[in-house]
Amino acid sequence: MKFVYTPSEAAEEGVRGPSDLPKLIDKAMSLARAPVSTFKVGAVGLTSSGEVFLGVNVEFPNLPLHHTIHAEQFLVTNLALNSMKKLTHIAVSVTGTIFGAPCGHCRQFYQEMRNAPEIEILIKRPKDGIDEFMSLKSLMPERFGPDSILPEDASLLLEQRDNSLVLSDPEEICSDPEDCSHTKCRALAAANKSYAPYSKCPSGVALICGGEVYKGWYIESVAYNPSLGPVEAALVDFVARGGGKEFNEITEVVLVEMKDVKVSQEATARTFLDKIAPKCDFKVLHCYKTNKN
């Protein structure tokens, strides 16, 4: 199970440029988890530095549909988790032969990237003789994006950020939380990368399964509803690196967020985890923002 390809690994799969992205779509679709719709969606994306990333839809039975992770959301979250800076091209399919534009939800989600209007999307319908790339700008010409609200120099999605958060409880935190195996350290590190410029309520999650730590952070949309929660983001990491493990094998989850804020993840995270990982130990740790920045 592979969700990230270096340029040389992509070339071995026959992907040497944007027009070759469909060569990996079957692999992407095979990794989707779609027990509700049974429609396995795959997304293949190319970065400005030549890496190729896969995205898949992930659905959760017995939960509201808004918990669903769209393949395009998975793809961008996968980029963020791997510190990629720029997505340039994307191909999305549910059939392996017909490629279409992202849904409106994902078109809006993608607006958080600085180069969103220039992202090229493969449109391919063999029966109609259509095989071309279209810019996201052409698919969403009158966009509502970060520039409608945020200052011009604001850090956007996939750009470096540090929310300057520390835990409220003065427990010892490892000097390099990115490399340690403590869930509280990894969850705090995730929260510090959280993209929440509108609510200013960053949060992060770390979870453990089989001794491995997975993490993710809240990714906000200017349109609010397309935002991706921190548990969902951590599950992107889990699906991408977990080797096919099931959600009910997760044993521990830690959420780090600020206390008494307008946007809290605790209640929805608890409901979510009660369904997908009922035996996990769920903890919430509060943090606060320092005056570092």
From Swiss-Prot:
SUPFAM superfamilies: Cytidine deaminase-like. Binds 1 zinc ion per subunit. The keyword Hydrolase applies. It is an enzyme of class 3 (hydrolase). Its cofactor is Zn(2+). Zn(2+) binds at H70, C103, C106. Substrate binds at N57, V58, E59. InterPro entries: CMP_dCMP_dom (IPR002125), Cyd/dCyd_deaminase_Zn-bd (IPR013171), Cyt/Deoxycyt_deaminase (IPR050202), Cyt_deam_dimer (IPR006263), Cytidine_deaminase-like (IPR016193). It catalyses: cytidine + H2O + H(+) = uridine + NH4(+); 2'-deoxycytidine + H2O + H(+) = 2'-deoxyuridine + NH4(+). Gene3D superfamilies: Cytidine Deaminase, domain 2 (3.40.140.10). GO terms for biological process: cytidine deamination. Keywords: Hydrolase, Metal-binding, Zinc. One of its GO terms (molecular function) is cytidine deaminase activity. Belongs to the cytidine and deoxycytidylate deaminase family. Homodimer. PANTHER family: CYTIDINE DEAMINASE (PTHR11644:SF2). This is Cytidine deaminase 6.
